[in-house]
Amino acid sequence: MKKLLIYIAAFAMILAMNTSCEDMGSLEEHPKKVDATTFMANAKEVESVINSIYFQLRRDPGFSRYLIVLEEGLADYCIGRGNYATAYDTGLTSGGVGFSKDSWAVLYRAIRFANNILDGIGNTPLSQQEYNNLTGETRFLRAFAYSWLARNWGAVPFFDEQNMNDFNKPRTPEADIWKFVIDEADYAASNLPEVAKAAGRPSRYAALALKTEACLYAGRYEEAAEAAGLIISSKRYSLVEVGKADDFLDLYGHTANATSEEIFYIKFNRDSGSTIAYMYLCKPNPFVNMGAVGIYTDYQKNKFIQNWDQNDLRYQFGLYKQTQNGTLNALTK
């Protein structure tokens, strides 16, 4: 069980074998470059374009559903169902490609918005602090998107504001992608505020957290420890105290917000259209009847669940049991 933060999203499978729930089509959207002479005329207008990056990340193929299921379906504690089962079994069936290509697309769309902003922001009349904060946030989000591309696909095509109109580019080596993410995180950490200007937006410490993770992927362990140490020494964050299973509601519950553990997060609720909850149920079940929903775990057959210490508070909080066709299943909350 993981927290609904930047590392968790939920996914659904109400679709045909070769299509995904939200039809992303292709990347051929006939995009129009932002004209800084008619738009991005001030800091608020730049922020409105930055919000478009967040919108891409929050779409169904992003962190609302598909993106993480490709990883969750591979976890020892989960079993994929329907098209999500193919991500575990083969990875590249027609159904599996439908999900992964859409996740790929939203990440590159987020990058495209970031590149457009960085290409045009030099024409916007801004104070030095506004420029630093806005470019820091934009470059953080672009690096964040590249980090998810690299962790899922390794070497990927690379586009920035200098070459964003080049097409049919070959893949850039994975090591170069991680170097870019680390360099961008350094810039963001130097230009973002100590305290995020709004909930859900990045701060200096979000950039340091991104650098920490990127350095681990890149095998730059001393730099990872140094960046993490700066977060720890700030004393701005701490673990939520848990003494009984229900205390996890203080961290994962629907009323939890801006807890002491949260550095950067993308959150969803019932009204936002996210389907995270039902993606962790199997069908049929007494809670929701909505297709052959996504991932769950089998209590009797899954060795990870069988061997999990039932005195572990995470076990007590994160699993509940349901009978399906005479088989007892444990489902993540």
Question: Which residues make up each language-model segment?
Answer:
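Elongated scaffold/linker segments in the mid-to-C-terminal portions of large proteins
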Residues: 85, 89, 98-102, 233, ...
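Bacterial N-terminal signal peptides that target proteins for export
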Residues: 1-8
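Acidic, glycine-rich segments characteristic of secretory precursors and extracytoplasmic regions
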Residues: 4, 21-70, 306
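Short linear capping/connector segments at secondary-structure termini
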Residues: 31-34, 92-95, 160-167, 244-245
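Conserved, well-structured interaction surfaces
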Residues: 42-43, 47-51, 55-61, 83-153, ...
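Short, surface-exposed recognition loops and adjoining beta-strand edges that mediate ligand/DNA contacts
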Residues: 64-81, 159, 193-210, 216-283
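Bacterial Sec-type N-terminal signal peptides, specifically the leucine/valine-rich hydrophobic h-region
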Residues: 14-18, 146
